[in-house]
């Protein structure tokens, strides 16, 4: 049975404190490697992702619309940051981070606006083909971002963060072979351990074992420390706007124009992944949650994160499901995951900085695999060709844009889905003709009359035949837009020019009101 009422404040926080605290602690362990890895994808120091994970989790626990959902730095949002960070660093070394913080603030403002505009209602109409193309493109991009650590240093462009990672992680063939060996071992642990026990996250076990091997054998391979410094204390307030000499970005229209595309893309892609996660948790827990409240909460969380040196993010599907499977049900689990993460990175930074990048690569490969819509790919030959076309369009546009733009891919997929759906609906309209007597013809119209179907509608009338009287029966049809009105208007006008008396009958009230508003003065004479 689905609960429709909002739980009391006490139940939202303290419904099952023991399970929530334990689950939050386990989730924090799983968040650390991903936050560090996503920082590398975005081209910033690990502490940016870690501070973001802390700020986002704590804030969303307070103002979010879905209990027990985990919000942190994510692959989908990190991939959208790469171009902006690299461009900012190109303007002035180190300035990319300030541009990223400015984009995070604007992202938050957009998401608060989307929440008040009830964007969640519109996102319900995103078809499955678009979602499939989105997650498959995301999976491939996450996998592609691991290439530098594996020695696959393809050139992606002057302002691409993957090239930035390749520059700061130069490794030779000996190190590459060691990295590949550790990655394979890590994958074996991650996929093999759950067959034996699920008491601890297999990703965490893999990281610990690979770190012990790397340190014990004194392997000369890249580690987390290679990417940058880990935080030594709590995040501090920092406003991104100011003097360039102070490492800030100027508060002007040029800065706004630079960060606007990234902020807009992150706000939309982040909410799409968040709403998807929200639907999954609603289904798992047999509850409902408010997506518009969640959208505003995500916006507030991203603004707080950006003001305290963290990157923007969104809900994490994997960690959110992990939290609920471990018994997390209230806001306390989300809050404690963020607090635990911060305590671990501040007190355990000496150990975390020795984690080999190979361990994070193994983790990210498993994330890429779990992100991909493998069932959709397996059933590619069975699903309708229109759905396949939408999925491929979303995937292709994302992969072919530079930098890779998930938001643009989604928009392209939605546009194609709309066109294909319109074509299907257009063919449903039908016009049949009956000869009442020698002096009268009766046309019966059924279906939806709008801008796409008007061609099929017009083809149903023989305007060269002019009996004394023509009746157009619209009782089983509906006019949706100006194009539909214009099409009916055109038929009436041409028959009347030929000398026929035209009468339109059966228009429903909505169609009649629309015709009377924009019919151009032609009276349909409905009865």
Residue ranges and their predicted role:
Residues 1-420, 424-429:
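Transmembrane helical cores of multi-pass ion-transport proteins
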Residues 241, 370-523, 527:
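The feature marks cytosolic C-terminal regulatory regions of anion transporters and related permeases
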């Amino acid at each position: 049975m689905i609960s429709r009422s909002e739980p009391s404040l006490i139940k939202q926080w303290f419904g099952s404190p023991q399970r929530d605290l334990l689950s939050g602690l386990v989730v924090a362990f799983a968040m650390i490697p991903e936050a560090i890895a996503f920082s590398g994808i975005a081209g910033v120091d690990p502490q940016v992702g870690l501070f973001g994970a802390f700020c986002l989790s704590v804030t969303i626990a307070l103002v979010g619309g879905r209990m027990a959902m985990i919000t942190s730095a994510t692959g989908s949002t990190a991939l959208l940051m790469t171009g902006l960070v690299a461009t900012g660093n190109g303007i002035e070394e180190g300035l990319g981070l300030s541009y990223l913080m400015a984009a995070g603030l604007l992202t938050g403002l957009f998401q608060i606006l989307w929440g008040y505009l009830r964007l969640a209602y519109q996102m319900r109409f995103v078809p499955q083909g678009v979602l499939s193309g989105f997650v498959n493109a995301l999976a491939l991009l996450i996998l592609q971002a691991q290439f530098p650590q594996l020695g696959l240093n393809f050139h992606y462009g002057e302002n691409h963060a993957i090239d930035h990672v390749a520059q700061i992680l130069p490794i030779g063939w000996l190190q590459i072979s060691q990295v590949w060996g550790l990655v394979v071992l890590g994958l074996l642990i991650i996929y093999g351990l759950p067959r034996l026990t699920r008491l601890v996250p297999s990703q965490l076990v893999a990281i610990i074992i690979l770190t012990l091997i790397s340190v014990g054998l004194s392997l000369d391979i890249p580690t987390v420390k290679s990417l940058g410094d880990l935080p030594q204390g709590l995040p501090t307030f920092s406003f991104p706007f100011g003097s360039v000499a102070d490492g800030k970005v100027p508060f002007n229209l040029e800065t706004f124009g630079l960060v606007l595309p990234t902020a807009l893309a992150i706000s939309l892609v982040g909410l799409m992944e968040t709403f998807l996660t929200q639907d999954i948790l609603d289904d798992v827990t047999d509850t409902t949650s408010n997506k518009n409240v969640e959208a505003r909460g995500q916006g507030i969380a991203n603004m707080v994160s950006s003001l305290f040196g963290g990157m923007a993010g969104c809900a994490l599907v994997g960690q959110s499901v992990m939290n609920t499977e471990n018994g997390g049900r209230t806001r306390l689990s989300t809050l404690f995951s963020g607090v635990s993460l911060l305590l671990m990175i501040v007190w355990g930074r000496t150990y975390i900085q020795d984690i080999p990048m190979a361990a994070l690569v193994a983790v990210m490969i498993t994330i890429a695999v779990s992100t991909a819509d493998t069932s959709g790919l397996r059933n590619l030959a069975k699903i309708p060709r229109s759905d396949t076309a939408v999925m491929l369009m979303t995937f292709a546009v994302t992969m072919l844009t530079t930098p890779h733009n998930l938001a643009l891919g989604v928009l392209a997929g939605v546009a194609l889905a709309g066109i294909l759906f319109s074509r299907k609906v257009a063919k449903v309209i039908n016009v049949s003709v009956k000869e009442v007597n020698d002096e009268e013809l009766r046309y019966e119209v059924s279906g939806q009359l709008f801008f796409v179907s008007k061609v099929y509608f017009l083809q149903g009338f023989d305007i060269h035949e002019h009996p004394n009287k023509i009746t157009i029966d619209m009782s089983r049809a509906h006019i949706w837009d100006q194009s539909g009105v214009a099409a009916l208007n055109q038929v009436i006008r041409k028959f009347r020019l030929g000398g026929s008396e035209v009468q339109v009958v059966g228009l429903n009230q909505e169609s009649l009101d629309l015709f009377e508003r924009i019919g151009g003065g032609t009276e349909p004479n409905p009865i």
